[in-house]
């Protein structure tokens, strides 16, 4: 599964990062490199992006973090 496919399938869903619940949601992606995780608080280390990155963000959060797809697992509700 590519980052874009993962993003399209799981936008806004909560995910585990390396098996831990860190309060992250699927917010976007950066080409084939990273999934952008969004946080409702300021847990993430990124607050703003350039306009190029904003094109791939589907939902707005208070902070963000990059993650490799291989470390993510969607929490099924």
Residue ranges and their predicted role:
Residues 76-77:
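Short acidic DE-rich linear segments
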